[in-house]
Every structure is written in C-alpha cells, then in structure tokens.
C-alpha cells in the first residue's frame, strides 16, 4: 500500500496533558448514572451523569459503559471527535522523521505519539526505575524496580532484508474471551458469552459437563478489580497476591448467566460456537468490558507414547507420559473500534493448535475493515487444521500458508500460529505478536518481535508468501509449563516479568487459563489508558528519542493462555 495513501486523511491528535508524577493509587470502579433502577452506586466512586454511563456487569440497561479512575480524567478526555493519543487518534506521520534514515516510515494508529520532539538520549536515560504496587483482585502486588534491558519491545530487532510488507499497524478487536475444555475448537472472532465446556473422550462416547455462566456480576467485578497505582510498570518479586487471586477465582465462579453463547455436542466431537454480544451490551466508544470466557482442553496425544531402548541383546519400551494442552483466551477492543468488530482475531483448535492475528488499522483510511483480513487468516488456519485431522501432520507455516492463500479480503496483519504435538511446541511468527513460555515462575523461552523500527512491525499482506517471512520456533515443553500468546496490546503495556509472576501465582491458586487471560487483558487495558505510568511502550519510545513520553498504549488486546498438563485418560 502506498505510504502517501496511508497517510491521507490523518490529522494530528490534540495535545495530551503533560505527564504527571505518580501519586496515590486511584481506585478504579465501574460507574453507573444515579437513579438507574436496579444498579447500585459503587461506594467512593465519582460518577458522571452527563456521560450516560451504565454499569457493564450483570443486567445492564443501555448506554456506554465507562471505566473511570478516581478523578474521572478519562471521561473528561473521552470527548466524541476529539480523541487524544490515549484513545488512539490517527496521527500517522508523527514519527516519520524518526524513520527516514531506515528508508521507510510508519506509525501505529493506536499508539501514535503527538506533541513530542525526537531527541537523542542514552540508554541509561531511556528508562527510570520506579517502585510501584498493583493488585490482583484488590490485593497489592509489590513490584520492585525493573532492571534496564536492551531487549525493549517496539525497538527495531528483526528486519527481513528486501521485504516490504503492508502498512504500519494496529488498533482494535471485538471483545471476547474464550476458554474451552473440548474435543474440537473455539473461535474468538466475535463476542462470546461466558461458558465452560469440559469433555473427556473414551472410545466412542463422550462425557460432557457443561456450565454456562455470564457476564461478571457486580460482585465478580469487585473481585476482578485491579486497584493498581496508575504508575505500575517496573517488575520484580510479587508478594501478598494469594488472597487476591482467590478473590478473582471466586468472582469468576460466581458469575451470572448471559446470552450470546451456543454449545453443541456431537458424540465424540464437541464444538463450541459463540455469537457476538448485542450492540446494547457493548462499549459505545470509551468503556471497558470484562472479557467473557470459555474453555477448551484439547488432548493432543491419544495414547501413551513409547521410546525403544536397546541394551546389548534385548530391547525394551519406555512409556512416556501423555501431555495435553489446556488453552483459554480473552479479548478486549480498542474503544473506538468496537462497533466495527475490532481488528484482532485468534483461534483455538483441538490437538494443540492456536494462534493470534492483529490487523493493520491503516486500511480503514481506504474504507476497508482492517480486521477482516486477520479474521480470515484465523478462520483459514482453523479450517486447515480441522481438514487435516487423520492426515500426516501439517507444519505451522504450512497451515498459515494455506490460510493466507484462501484469504480474500484486502489487508495486512501480524500473525502467530502454534502447535503442541504432545512434547514439542512448534510456532511460526510474523510481526510483533508473540509468546512467552513460563516455567517455574520464570521466562523459559520467548519469541522476538519482528519490526522495521519503532512501532512499525513486519506484516503479511494478501498475496505475500508466508514461507519468506516467518520466523520459526521449536521448544521442548514439560508438564506445568505455561504459554502466553498475545498481540502487542499485551506486551506494549505489561512487562514480561509481571506476566510471569501473574501466571505463577494464578496457577498456584488453581485458576483456569481463561481466568488468567481475563486478568492479563484487563491489566493491559488499564495501563493503556494511563497517561503517566511507565510501560514497555514508553520505554521503547524514550529509547528512540521521544523524550518525555509516558504512559501505556491504548490498543486492542488478545491473550491466549495455554497450560501443559498430564492426560487423565
């Protein structure tokens, strides 16, 4: 796509208020207008009648849901038609001067930087250590200072020589959460009702325990509330979180039922299909929904594997444990993209397959739904996996290539496709979506962002050959390992060490993958809305010369959490 065409129609965003020093933690709450029948005001939470806000949990009446801080700053900034950088105003070209020396220019619509002059800074000036505190479910997360690192997300790390793909990246997604324990697949393209499906397959029969729950009630929201200081960024040891994790688990288990979710059972083949929530239930521009969830546990090995061991004149067989992958996902949209369905997508299919994609928002300036191409990629991957069952196993890059060949919509996207074969994780990646493998509370392996430069990721566009673009990974996994796969909406706002700590504490508390994904998505959204906190994105901006930038990057967020478990079959 011609870069001048991409920049057409873009106007600078209104200047943002200068970054303030981090003060006392602002209590986050879900506001509702006074006088609305059946909705209780949250104690100590300022509400704004003129914003038309309603509670976004339980049986909400109608109108936009608003997640506000104690001083209501987000509401004051969230004026129709006057979006600042916190709300993702298209400001293509702001960093163009910064990228000229690389021979190209690009910007991320959701994270464009405005009113900041590029200057040269040393790496030591690019980041500062802050002592911060956060919470899971209201309990404090005591975070130490984050050591400086040269592996800052958003900075140029992987450049494919001779490749020019698409346009610069990013915006929104439809609000979804999916986690399933199933014998088939789950698809996160549209909004879901919260549910849980567990199926164990033995021979020709299937035993199913199904429970459909709903949007988090006010009690559930209180349990999920992240009373985090606006300036949460540096990461170290995390303490006093067990109680908070327990509260979050209880809140999720006590959720009320919602519509929009359909579950179908077919003997040994169980498929979960969910439709999107209605317009009345969605954010009308600036609110935040707690993601809905559904779960799928997929058995990737149908029996015990054996390894032959030779010893002089005899041969014996050593039985290896059968491992399965339990995966769950959650999504939240960029507030300005809810009504168009968002631009993130993902899929979870049985036999250990999953993936995420992040459509490039710049296509919307040409009248194209930027999320269609990403959704077609994920649909195509799921279709290829389902059609190949019983045939020789396909490689991840082959699945992606088949999906890309069948995609019909114009567009471009970052994409990651992964498969766990019972012992080894195989993954292929294009762009700045990525994964972390967490073992015993530590980051064991991770992918590298593939970018042309700051905030300008590599992308696959319709007609491109994925084999020339992908970066491939093979990682041996063991029982208890966790995989966090996500679009850059997570990694730009939440430090990797914090993600690892959340995974560790959540698994100790027995939370499901979808519940962990929910918390990570809500955490990323919270940091993305802050104009003052330190984040991986602000670190990257400072590192390339945007002196004075602070805060997160408001974006659509998609997270898939997968846990390696021993099969009970």
From Swiss-Prot:
It comes from the Eukaryota. Induction: By salicylic acid (SA), benzothiadiazole (BTH), hydrogen peroxide, abscisic acid (ABA), wounding, salt, cold and osmotic stresses. Its EC number is 3.1.3.16. Disulfide bonds: none annotated. Residues 174-183 have a biased composition (Low complexity). Residues 166-212, 251-279 are annotated as: Disordered. Residues 329-564 form the PPM-type phosphatase domain. Pfam families: PP2C_2 (PF13672). It is an enzyme of class 3 (hydrolase). Mn(2+) 2 binds at residues 358, 488, 555. GO terms for molecular function: metal ion binding; protein serine/threonine phosphatase activity. Signal peptide: none annotated. InterPro entries: PPM-type-like_dom_sf, PPM-type_phosphatase-like_dom, PPTC7. Keywords: Hydrolase, Magnesium, Manganese, Metal-binding, Protein phosphatase. Gene3D superfamilies: PPM-type phosphatase domain. It catalyses: O-phospho-L-seryl-[protein] + H2O = L-seryl-[protein] + phosphate; O-phospho-L-threonyl-[protein] + H2O = L-threonyl-[protein] + phosphate. Mn(2+) 1 binds at residues 358-359. Its cofactor is Mg(2+); Mn(2+). Binds 2 magnesium or manganese ions per subunit. The keyword Transmembrane does not apply. Belongs to the PP2C family. May play a role in responses to biotic and abiotic stresses. This is Probable protein phosphatase 2C BIPP2C1. The gene is BIPP2C1.
